[in-house]
Curated annotation (Swiss-Prot):
This is Tubby-like F-box protein 14. Signal peptide: none annotated. It comes from the Eukaryota. InterPro entries: F-box-like_dom_sf, F-box_dom, Tubby-like_C, Tubby_C, Tubby_C_CS. Pfam families: F-box-like, Tub. SUPFAM superfamilies: F-box domain (SSF81383), Tubby C-terminal domain-like (SSF54518). Residues 56-114 form the F-box domain. Belongs to the TUB family. CDD domains: F-box_AtTLP-like. Ubiquitous. PANTHER family: TUBBY-LIKE F-BOX PROTEIN 14, TUBBY-RELATED.
Amino acid sequence: MSFRSIVRDVRDGFGSLSRRGFEVRLVGHRRGRSHSAVHELRDGHAAAAAADVVQSSCWANLPPELLRDVIERLEASEAAWPSRKNVVACAAVCRTWRDMCREIVKNPEFCGKITFPVSLKQPGPRNGAIQCFIKRDKSTQTYNLYLCLSSAVLVESGKFLLSAKRYSRATCTEYTIFMSADNTSRSSNMYIGKLRSNLLGTKFVIYDTQPPCNTANVSQSGKTSRRFYSRKVSPKNPSSTYSIAQVSYELNVLGTRGPRRMNCVMHSIPASSLEAGGTVPCQPDSVLARSLDESFGSISFSKSSIMDRSIRFSSSRYSDISVGGPMVGGQALGDSDESKERPLILRNKAPRWHEQLQCWCLNFKGRVTVASVKNFQLVAATQPAAGAPTPSQPAPPPPPDHDKVILQFGKVAKDMFTMDYRYPLSAFQAFAICLSSFDTKLACE
């Protein structure tokens, strides 16, 4: 039997284990919140019973050598979406299969692939960039992020990743970010963060629903963090209270037209992450350490639920690195001497003036085709470290990663924009930064 046949049999058998329990769950969802709460306990028992059946089935007792061979072959052959959903299906079979996937399936930093939704909050690849595109809908004020599956930037050729919705307030603008294009409620477990601007649209703060690593105990006092996989979380829990980054646009006091100038302070990423041997803290070195196991905390045991978005995943936590610290309820966290480390600061790459075209130009390597004030490229800003050389002393050359474009964003058609990101940014962070470029800036242009 080929490994493709094994995977097909697993999906079919897995879907028939608890079809009755899945139907009960669907009925509960149709009846609304109050009725679904009544049936929640019954659904939980059905899911638990199905989990016990799967755990004791023949698939859970496959010889480790055979199981490893199946997963390794599948990981190598199903490298791109939509066929990569088979890897997700294997990780959803049982704990034994999930543990094997934990050993074999690596995060985007090392494999350059987005497999599980938790990958959206993990750093991008070190070698190369993950190519995405954003589709804007002005009528509904929504922005959808897709993974490019081909050279053509079309929704039909993209894998949906994230969605954002714009809300105008009296003194600010908010962009709420979700893992679903349909469920855009703040009380939903699809809600993962937001972007908030000031009145002028010159300063933005990126918020995440998950706290930095060293703030788990602080978040329980007054502000409670939510876990996406838990079905017992009240929808009235407070959301996104952790500031992880700040984006600022320089004011244009002279009123002359020109490119925007922006800076990003990534409180959750240390500047040392770009140095030789540097890493983003609280990220797994080679496997989906803890988040993958939490990703399947409330799986619906059916074939359709495995292949669709009813699989719920946890979010990876951010680092405890901060200068000024991430903010929780207006108070800085992690300000001890041990935790103080310079955050990564990104700045936009200065464009050059093209005399023949009479416009400012950047080399996007064919990924951007329409001139727009929204287009930008971000590189690491050079920061003087402690004990930096004096002006009379020659400064050492910056690390090679400081010259690389970490994030680029630009227009390709009406309401279509490309977004390419790499290490140390995650897809969530890159998407939030790009959303800031859409907002109206009264004093920057």
